[in-house]
Curated annotation (Swiss-Prot):
Residues 293-307 have a biased composition (Low complexity). This is Small ribosomal subunit protein uS2. CDD domains: RPS2. Residues 271-282 have a biased composition (Polar residues). The gene is rpsB. Residues 263-330 are annotated as: Disordered. One of its GO terms (biological process) is translation. It comes from Mycoplasmopsis pulmonis (strain UAB CTIP) (Mycoplasma pulmonis). Residues 283-292, 313-330 have a biased composition (Basic and acidic residues). One of its GO terms (molecular function) is structural constituent of ribosome.
Length: 330
């Protein structure tokens, strides 16, 4: 009886320990929308093992496999960072740029948030020469481009601005990084290809349309949500910070301490125009009158278009036909 009681107490302790030290609570995965994949028509069959089910034409990713992959990635990155490994964060998607830059700067890592320049890893000589040019222009800018004409100064400023934008996160990169952490291997496939060619280990977020063969370790998750990207990248950054003696923000923390950012809603131009429209009597009258005018013009154009063109074979016939076509397009 005593042995059974002891076993039960040990089992309870193990369960409590597992719940306390889970890398991320499932509730936070659900809050971040990590489980949302793409439409079923857009999936990659190689992602089948990571997909839980289908709902309303959308693939649902298996959160349990997300949790396991994320914890495994944390351990690998943590061990590598403890040995002095270097990392580069890559995310050129509009909604991923800010998060990538924030976590890379937090871990003192390299990062690319603008267009990946071909040859960043495979043609280091050219990249280093452009970085040297960046440093030279910055020194010239300190003296306000003294000794050059106003026109030359303007051109130098444009060049400097472009170089700073493209090389902001890799200007201090002297050697090849050991690991690449990429938000979307599909979008940044050139970066992934160069990393594979140079033997850089790749850890990436895999949505339902991704190819898991492109990365060394894939984390099945939604790569279109700010909350999802922030959750995954913060945990991976925690692994680096923890190895250097810092504190984890999300990894192995209490649920109350994990505060996710808000998803930014970007309205399309059509929707914003629709929202700003005033539906009072005056505006409705104007819309009605303009609609009538447009419909009359459209009917006239249709009548003219139904009339057959008179074929003339003089030298101006082609010009006349082109002019007529352009007017119809307008």
């Amino acid at each position: 009886m005593a042995e059974k009681t002891l076993r039960k107490s040990n089992e309870d302790k193990q369960v409590k320990t597992e719940n306390i030290y889970k890398i991320i609570p499932n509730s936070k995965f659900l809050e971040a929308g990590v489980y949302f994949g793409h439409r079923t028509q857009q999936w990659n069959p190689k992602m089948k093992k990571f997909i839980h089910s289908k709902r309303r034409g959308i693939h649902i990713l298996d959160v349990s496999k997300t949790s396991k992959a994320l914890e495994w990635a944390y351990k690998i990155i943590n061990a590598a960072a403890a040995k002095g490994a270097t990392f580069i964060f890559v995310g050129t998607k509009k909604h991923a740029k800010e998060i990538v830059k924030e976590q890379a700067q937090r871990t003192n890592s390299y990062y690319v948030t603008e267009r990946w320049l071909g040859g960043t890893l495979t043609n280091s000589k050219t990249i280093f020469s452009r970085v040297r040019r960046l440093f030279d222009l910055e020194k010239m800018a300190e003296n306000n481009f003294e000794g050059y004409t106003k026109k030359e100064g303007i051109e130098f400023k444009k060049e400097l601005s472009k170089l700073q934008k493209n090389f902001e996160g890799i200007r201090e990169m002297k050697t090849q990084p050991n690991f690449m952490i990429v938000v979307d291997p599909n979008v940044d496939r050139i970066a992934v290809k160069e990393a594979r060619d140079k033997g850089v280990k790749i850890i990436g977020i895999l949505d339902s349309d991704a190819n898991p063969d492109f990365v060394d370790l894939g984390i099945p998750a939604n790569d279109d949500s700010i909350k999802s990207i922030s959750l995954i990248l913060t945990v991976l950054a925690d692994a680096i910070v923890n190895a250097k003696g810092g504190k984890d923000l999300f990894a192995y923390q209490d649920e109350a301490n994990i505060i996710l950012p808000e998803d930014k809603k970007i309205d399309s131009p059509q929707r914003s125009h629709f929202n700003n429209t005033r539906f009072d009597q005056s505006s409705s009258r104007e819309h009605r009158d303009s609609w009538r005018r447009n419909s009359q013009n459209t009917s006239q154009n249709q009548e003219q278009s139904q009339r057959p063109y008179k074929r003339t074979y003089n030298k101006d016939s082609r010009e006349t036909l082109d002019k007529k076509t352009k007017e119809e397009v307008k």
